[in-house]
């Protein structure tokens, strides 16, 4: 009778029954050789385990595909684990979470068409693509203010400044420039000179001014329009000084006395002139007494400001528009009030073209 161990070792291995492969999580058990003694106790034999025998034979296609399916299933489970969002609810985060869930479902189903349907041509879902976000909803400021110091001057490179400098002109360039300017001056049409304020009165001479000063104690002697447009009128004259408070005022109008303005004049003492030596013959020259200034007289100066709209736009009908400025001089002192109004006609200035342009 043969020993049981020898009978097991000599038994021809037959085809093992089909069984499913162990799961991927479980590692295969190591092959342990089986050592059994013979009937006489002196012999020893190593018998491979059934798992080792299964490893020696070729696997069927179904058995080879089983471990691969297990690995794919585990990988899918890992991908399906959603990331936790600890931040507060936000539309952008919700949209990102929704997109991640759609991608995970598409991977789990293994369908590429589902992912294409959820994603637009730009790689984002239609819900995220049409969403508008404002800075205040994200906790940001709607406006940013930047302060600049006046002391911070920009550092301009010298190469940039060199481009702004004019190139040195040659003699030929200057000659050509002079010819071009002369041609332009000839080709330009001569425009009519602008109209100016012209006095419509005649100021008295020295003798008449002295006589008027003695008669009415105030006399206008000079009028001048300082600018071409006549926006300012300056004048001067003399008054007889008297004790007590005194003041000179110029009243003028440019609305034909529908309204008027009073401008105070500045009073100054009349400067003293050096006495001229007497003629050796003892006879005075004719008219020399007219130039003598009255003793105790004071000079006054005034300035009238006019609005800019008085000058006519059309130079041709400047004389017909009737734009005029009327004024008179008033002298107030302790003895009373005195006027110099051009013998009741007032001093009048009117816009007119120069005489040489007519």
From Swiss-Prot:
For the CBM21 domain, which residue ranges apply?
210-350
Q: Which UniProt keywords apply?
A: Phosphoprotein
Q: Which positions are tagged coiled coil? A: none
Q: Which residues carry this modification: Phosphoserine?
A: 86
Return the annotated region ranges for Disordered.
1-71, 270-295
Q: What InterPro entries does this protein map onto?
A: CBM21_dom (IPR005036), CBM21_dom_sf (IPR038175), PP1_regulatory_subunit_3 (IPR050782)
One GO BP on record is: glycogen biosynthetic process
List GO molecular-function terms, semicolon-separated: glycogen binding; protein phosphatase 1 binding
Compositionally biased spans, kind Low complexity = 11-29, 270-280
CC annotations in GO = protein phosphatase type 1 complex
Q: Which Pfam families match?
A: CBM_21 (PF03370)
PANTHER family assigned: PROTEIN PHOSPHATASE 1 REGULATORY SUBUNIT, PROTEIN PHOSPHATASE 1 REGULATORY SUBUNIT 3G
Its biological purpose is as follows: Glycogen-targeting subunit for protein phosphatase 1 (PP1). Involved in the regulation of hepatic glycogenesis in a manner coupled to the fasting-feeding cycle and distinct from other glycogen-targeting subunits.
**What is the protein name given in its UniProt record?**
Protein phosphatase 1 regulatory subunit 3G
In the UniProt record, what gene is named as encoding this protein? PPP1R3G
